[in-house]
Each structure stands twice: as structure tokens, then as C-alpha cells.
């Protein structure tokens, strides 16, 4: 008789994993890291269903932490407090400046976002509300400046010579992607609203920036370059990689050539691709930030069409 060994199921997230003893409870490494971070940062999550969420508890951080304590038996007093502020989210540092090391309450809408919502309601009664309507209260930036942020990313020029569609070897591809990944990490630090996200969410959005830089922007630069018809020697390329590059050329590249974007339109397109948030799980806070980026860029693009072009509404709807 054949015995099939399977990984045990974590009692918190209910996923098969390597379960070990962490902080007094038998859980997976991911739930242990979540528990450590929550306790060390003194965070209390709220659940809009009063800790009665069904299904996988990873989707609700309040229920996940509740299961860490009540089901797995993890103990808060076994977690060491952080000795420095390295990798501490900005919203935690700002809260500590205002109220010391008091408990930080977070939920489906963060406390910071609640303050902004209250400020937004007060601003609606202000005589300057027309001047303020083009400013995102959450991102703390105007729609026009938000679009300019993405325009700057594609016009600063230091990525033009790092095009993955022109690579000649796997080594060159790895070198280019490594540089793009570092640039994506730098961009994330200055992206409006990212300072409001947890480290897990920041790592997720960084993946979208990386993919956008490596493939979407490469396709754009390839389309705009004068040497796109030069034959590349692909004899040294890995067959799978070559197949994927050809697929990018036959799909994304063809679509971009048909849309005929100018620089401003492509910047808006790239931002929408980054914040589409389809392929990785995201938190409620991250979805709020994504919606702010989408609405801000869309409004700025609409203003651009109405002010500087004759394309008006038809082009905006096509976009």
C-alpha cells in the first residue's frame, strides 16, 4: 500500500504548509510573520463582519489574528518589540509622533483614511471646494500632478537602452530585469499613497511596477525606437523566453501600435496597468489607493483632451 505524505494544514489560514511552533502555537511561517508584525507594531485590525468572516481567514486580517490567538494559541508576550524603526510603515511612525506607542486601529478603512474623509466633508462646505475638487484627499496630490508623475517615469530616459524585446541572451535578460526591479523599488518609495500601505501590499505593488517596466514600457520604447526592424540574433536565447518575447510582440506591441498613444496617453495607460490589481491578492486599503490612482489619472486625461486637443469625449471613451 502506497502512503502519500501531505503537508499539515495551518489552523489559522487553512492552507497546507510546513507547520511549526511559533510564539506558542503551531502555525505556518506566513501566519507567524503576520502575528509578529501585528504585535510588534501594536496594531488592532477591525472586521466589518464582527470577526465572523467565512472562508479563508487570510482575506480578513482581524479574523486571521483572532484565529492566531484563539485557535492556534499564539501568545502576544512571546513577541519581541522592535528595537528600531527600519521597515516600519510611515503611518505607524506618524502615529507614534502624535500619540506615542498607543494601539493603532486599522480595518476596512484605516484611521488615516477616516480623518481624510472627515476633512473631505468639511472641505465640501468651504467656498474653495471648486478649487479642491481636482485634488485627491487620500493621495494628497492633484490629478494633473499625479499624471505628470507617470509621465516623468517614461520620459526620464534612463530605461530606453534596457529593452527586453531587444535582448540577445538570457544573461542580458537577467541583467536588464535586475536593473528594472531595482528601479521599481525606487519608484515605489515615491509613488503617491504607497506610504499608507503595509509591507505586504508594497511588495505586491512593486511586482506590478516591475512587470510594467520590463514588458509594457519595453514594448512602448520598442515601438518608438528607430531600430525596431533590425533583425536580432536569437540563436543564444532560451526557447521558452524567445516564445514569450514573440508573444509580447504579437499581442501587446500590436495593440499599442493600433492605439497610437502619445506620451501622455501611454503614461495614463501604464498607470492603469499597474493598479489593475488582478493577479495578486490585495487588501482593502490597497484597493482604495488603486481606485484613487485610476480616478485621478482618468480625470487628468479627460482634462488634457478637453483643454489641449480636439479629440474630446470620443477619444476619452475609446481610451
Curated annotation (Swiss-Prot):
Keywords: DNA-binding, Metal-binding, Nucleus, Receptor, Transcription, Transcription regulation, Zinc, Zinc-finger. Gene3D superfamilies: Erythroid Transcription Factor GATA-1, subunit A, Retinoid X Receptor. GO terms for molecular function: DNA-binding transcription factor activity; sequence-specific DNA binding; zinc ion binding. SMART domains: HOLI, ZnF_C4. Its main location: nucleus. Residues 7-81 bind DNA. Residues 130-319 form the NR LBD domain. A zinc finger (NR C4-type) spans 10-31, 47-63. It is found in: Nucleus. GO terms for cellular component: nucleus. InterPro entries: NHR-like_dom_sf (IPR035500), Nucl_hrmn_rcpt_lig-bd (IPR000536), Znf_hrmn_rcpt (IPR001628), Znf_NHR/GATA (IPR013088). The keyword Cell membrane does not apply. PANTHER family: NR LBD DOMAIN-CONTAINING PROTEIN-RELATED (PTHR46397:SF3), NUCLEAR HORMONE RECEPTOR FAMILY-RELATED (PTHR46397). Belongs to the nuclear hormone receptor family. Orphan nuclear receptor. This is Nuclear hormone receptor family member nhr-174.
